[in-house]
Amino acid sequence: FAIPEDFGTEEEYRKRYTEKDLFDEFTQDENGNVVLDEDAAKAKIKRLGGYDKLYRIKLEADYLAKLAFDGAKRLYGDPLSDEVKERLVFELYIMKTMGFPGYFLIVQDFINAARTQLGVSVGPGRGSAAGSAVAYCLGITKIDPIQYDLLFERFLNPDRISLPDIDVDFDDDGRGEVLRWVTEKYGQEKVAHIITYGTMATKLAIKDVARVQKLPLSESDRLAKLVPDKIPDKKLNLPNAIAYVPELQVAEASPDPLVRDTLKYAKMLEGNVRGTGVHACGTIICRDDITDWVPVSTADDKETGEKMLVTQYEGSVIEDTGLIKMDFLGLKTLSIIKEAVENVRLHRGVKLDIDKISIKDPATYKLYCDGRTIGTFQFESAGMQKYLRELQPSTFEDLIAMNALYRPGPMDYIPDFIDRKWGRKPIEYDIPIMEKYLKDTYGITVYQEQVMLLSRLLADFTRGESDAL
């Protein structure tokens, strides 16, 4: 990511900061306390790439902090509250000392370009990234994690080395435009898609070998149909299927060499790569030419027909090379919303900003209270509609809780949740101070975040320990 020169350069940072300055900054905690012994501190510096790399990371981290605090002042007002400042300082410290500031600068760059330059609709944020206040202040997400008690540790845990993973939703039609923008900005040789390998499953291995062996199609189909969909307590593969199905044992000992050899070679080929594809959304953006890090091949872009670079390592291996995968997702729902907003503008003369519409709109709650939610993701099943009519949701938090509760296991608590909302059952807390985190869900523990926060409140767990629960 190209940082504006008027902010600073690596050369200036090398003159301004000594290696001792960097050692202290990257091995102490966010409050300047020594938390690592000397050997662990040296190992951390080495893991981050040594002092030469640290100068770049610090420059990126300082610029990221500037953008985050500028965004925070726009969103929360100036001066910032102590809660917001402490949250940002902690998150920025974790991002810096894990070596990820450049990643966040790139993500905010293409998301803001999509919104402001390309006119592409971007989702409000999904998954654990919505727990980052820095991501919110940068415009990566549109959900205030502090307001909704979303936790950063579910995204990046200081006690668990893990790569950041931000799934970014774009409208279906605009996803390709964003990818082209990224390729043009960062360079065609520095951007690549990720290969996928399709392997031979059990039935497919039988059919492929049978075709080459010129086994009659009817016999090929018969053998494939003998393979069960699952085997109790065992992995589904051909050796286990033969041991489980008597007819396959007979076929394996068949006097017909074509039948015997079909099963023999299918066992040898099962699980081997049959073909390649391109990951639907995974993309790599590299600071150097991608070929300096991984072998690449080319594939045809389905949208444009042009050739594009594809890594020859699949997603599960890419992380071991030090490269970070970014997911560019195309979401049809965003295209529908975008078209609806445009239709409102054309026919009603009203210009809507979908990110700023009220979440307290009475007419919308009336639809939910009536169970009229067909076509609404995760709220359209008959069972959900029934519970919505019983609940009569009146706050956004009610809808969030119903979405979390409507799944096997937690569903058992829905009647209790509804009764507590309407006063038919008392709202009780095992320990009075638990009300702080359970009030919005009427005393019922619904979210993982509540468990994490309660463990810190009641048992003095650290941020990292609460995530490991």
Language model features with spans:
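Alpha-helical scaffold/interaction cores of sigma-54-like transcription cofactors
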Residues: F1-L469
